[in-house]
Amino acid sequence: MEVSNLNFALVLLSIAYAFGTAVMRTQKHSPSFLHSVPVVGLRKQAFSITRASLRQLFGGITTLLEGYSQYTQHDQPFAMYDLSSRQETLVPVKDVKWFAEQPDSQLSSHGVRQERHAVEHLHMGVDVPATMHFIERITGDRLTRNLDLLAQPMHEEIQRCIETEFGNDPEEWKEINVYDSVQDIVMPTMSRVFLGLPLCRDTKVVNALKRYVMALGLATIFIGSLPRLVKSVLAGLVKIPLAYYRRQTLAVLVPLIRRQLEHPAEGDSDSEQETGFLRSCAKISEKNAVGGIGNVVEPEIIAQWIMWLAFAGSSSTIIQATNLLLDLANCPKDMEVIQQLRQEAVSSLKSAEDWKDPQSFNKQVISDSAIRESLRFHPILIKGLTKEVVPSSGITLPNGTQMSKGSWVGIPVLGIHRDKRYYPDPETYDPFRFVPFRLNGELQAGTAWGSKLDAAKPTTTYLGFGYGRHACPGRWFATLMLKMILAEIVLHYEIEATAPPPQMRVIGDAALPPMSATIRPIALVKTFHLPSSAPKKIARDTKKPHSKFFSRQCPVSPQNWNLVE
């Protein structure tokens, strides 16, 4: 991990200093709010807003869950201050669909992106609207619609990287840092998709992208958390190392991209496939003029787009995969979660051809449930989908509350994901939580559960990938990668935890993965083969509840479910 404790302490000191000097002055610039929206976390004390905002540095979960319990569970909105002293109103579950259906002319994420994501202060180079347009187009045109073409190279890279990180010794457990190892699996795999061979295996290329993504991620959290008046001042300092990593990455990518676009490998179908993503980028640049950019193929522009896409895609996938492996490693051994995932992988991935077919992974109901549950249990943002009120006349929430222009409105994601009304025993990670619904949906085609319960499909109570038309456009690609990583691991390794599962760590809205946590994998003596007596399906057994599986950490291995012939 390239982030030292000293750097982290400096970040916290800078935030505290920024609050002490600027918060009170920023309050008069905030949009007005009606008193009809209750504010949670605001106490009757000196510098109340400043102190309420500072408490969100590490206490955001407490404030959000307090407001959720008092108001959201009674279908009422509430407001809370964020780390930058902005007030945000959070709507109840019944209003999530209404919220997502509002046009950008009413509720827009542009202003939030500029401030909370610090785009206005950190962005360098290519135009932001052009970049966002590119990400949406390339994700739909090249990733989501071509998963069948991407599956084989993705698997090759995942297989190679996992063997490098986990080793192949069947006699000794190897302790690994989960976050670092996942990073060294995800980054080369995404580079394989974006850049192809041999660039994805060029350590100079991958390390440059990795450093840039890390620097941009830290800068986004830091600058995005500051009051507006000090953002631009400190952003100038933060942009110095960020600009350095950006120049380094561009210096590596631009000549390589130019060479591949100008001199494609003729007559080599594999090479053509490997450079297909770059050619799709060029096609979008040629045919779509956005923000003054377009109708021209510029390697510099394509390189910057790929850097932003790598940041958007890899950051979230690394966090999700890290949490997933830690969740599974900490399940009680008598649940036999890894064994059941292994049996499922063997039955659905019987040949090399199956690995090339994304439909093979759609059959993995246990894997899908484990991933979905991890995203429920560890949302990347504890509150999200935040948008800004656009009309000068404001907007009216479904309960009649009037929100003025410039107000921020969002959704209490963590509160919804921990609501007992939707998820029994919500404080526990249960990898089998969604298995019964998924099977029921498949047996009764056309039911609501059958169409909704997929790790890549958001609902109003499952917001791991956002919701509505602005949900993560790369969620099917990310889910396929997570399933591939999981299948490759369970087919070739046993894994065990080295310590109890760490608590969720939140800074502001961002739920960070436990970057120092470790697990121990050990290679299986040989590739697992499904025995003739192995389970064929999962069926409901109401007569034999598996009470021994109840656990505070990972309960109910399939409670009221068992494996049958």
UniProtKB/Swiss-Prot annotation:
GO cellular component, one term: membrane
Membrane topology: Single-pass membrane protein
EC number in record: 1.-.-.-
Location(s), subcellular: Membrane
Transmembrane segment boundaries: 3-23
Gene Ontology terms for molecular function: heme binding; iron ion binding; monooxygenase activity; oxidoreductase activity, acting on paired donors, with incorporation or reduction of molecular oxygen
Lineage: Eukaryota, Fungi, Dikarya, Ascomycota, Pezizomycotina
Function: Cytochrome P450 monooxygenase; part of the gene cluster that mediates the biosynthesis of enfumafungin, a glycosylated fernene-type triterpenoid with potent antifungal activity, mediated by its interaction with beta-1,3-glucan synthase and the fungal cell wall. The pathway begins with the terpene cyclase-glycosyl transferase fusion protein that most likely uses 2,3-oxidosqualene as substrate and catalyzes glycosylation immediately after cyclization.
Enzyme class: oxidoreductase
Pathway(s) per entry: Secondary metabolite biosynthesis; terpenoid biosynthesis
Main location: membrane
Alphabetized InterPro entries for the sequence: Cyt_P450, Cyt_P450_CS, Cyt_P450_E_grp-IV, Cyt_P450_sf
Residues reported in the UniProt entry to bind heme: 472
Key words of the record: Heme, Iron, Membrane, Metal-binding, Monooxygenase, Oxidoreductase, Transmembrane, Transmembrane helix
Cofactor: heme
Gene3D superfamilies on file: Cytochrome P450
Gene Ontology terms: biological process: secondary metabolic process; terpenoid biosynthetic process
Protein's recorded name: Cytochrome P450 monooxygenase efuH
Family, as annotated: Belongs to the cytochrome P450 family.
